[in-house]
């Protein structure tokens, strides 16, 4: 997984 969006959420 990688950080997505302004919060670090899984893509």
Swiss-Prot record:
Entry-annotated residues carrying Cysteine amide:
11
Record PTM 4-hydroxyproline, positions in chain: 10
Broad class of where this protein is predominantly found: secreted
Entry GO CC: extracellular region
The free-text tissue note of the record is: Expressed by the venom duct.
- Lineage, top-rank taxon, reads Eukaryota
| Localisation | Secreted
Keyword tags: Amidation, Disulfide bond, Hydroxylation, Ion channel impairing toxin, Secreted, Toxin
How is it modified post-translationally? Contains 2 disulfide bonds.
The record's GO molecular-function terms, alphabetically, read: ion channel regulator activity; toxin activity
Q: What does the UniProt function comment say about this protein?
A: Probable toxin that inhibits ion channels.
Q: What is known of its domains?
A: The cysteine framework is I (CC-C-C). Alpha3/2 pattern.
Q: Provide the protein name.
A: Conotoxin Ama1245
UniProt organism field: Conus amadis
Could you read off the lineage of the organism from its UniProt record? Eukaryota, Metazoa, Spiralia, Lophotrochozoa, Mollusca
């Amino acid at each position: 997984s990688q950080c997505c969006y302004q919060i670090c959420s899984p893509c």
